Amino acid sequence: MNNQIFKRTLAITGLNFDEELALQAFKLGGYHTASKSKIKAWRTLDTSNHRYQAMPSDALTAFFDGLLILAE
């Protein structure tokens, strides 16, 4: 479920085209272990895809917190 929310949020915000800004949102939200490869894994919905990795809830929360900071 988190992957689906994350993927849709990236699309709505345009951050699917700006991974650096997405990484900044994670860092501002306090999640410092996000990476470009994790972003790719977390936006993958097909669980049979070798890239798929379930997005932890704390990562999604930090991402939203970072987006709020960026929006200020």
Language model: regions and residue ranges:
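Charged low-complexity interaction tracts in eukaryotic proteins
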Residues: 48-72
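A cross-kingdom feature marking solvent-exposed beta-strand/loop segments within repeated
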Residues: 3-4, 18, 24, 31-56
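A short, Lys/Arg-rich alpha-helix, primarily the initiator
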Residues: 1-15
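Short, structured motif recognition centered on aromatic/hydrophobic residues
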Residues: 6-9, 19-22, 26, 58-67
